[in-house]
Amino acid sequence: MIKAILFDLDGTLLPMDQDEFTKGYFKLLAAKLAPYGYEPKTLIDTVWAGTAAMVKNTGAQTNETAFWERFSRTYGAEKTERDKPLFEEFYADDFQRASVFCPRNDKAAETVAKLQRLGYRVALATNPIFPSI
């Protein structure tokens, strides 16, 4: 008997053009951090490198630790520690604006709601590369 349904979020329940989302997300992030001395290209390259470090992470450390260790190699430990709150602020306040690059899928929302009404447990899976907010 099926008791639970697992859905992939990005690109399945949440329609998105990965390139469009990435460009929009980086534009927002770069605009937030430019006043603090972050040149956009270097910042974007460093975030990509941090993302690669998370993907390669074997579980020996958290993805967050993997990301910040790689970030520190470019910007240094002192600047990284000092500026972490800027990133937290970005994800708490500005990141929501990136939702324009992932439009709502009403059919997906209806499907999930119907499955829940029918008593199924519904789980959403995604790659945890963004911080929890």
Predicted feature locations:
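A metal-dependent, Asp-based hydrolase signature
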Residues: 44-92
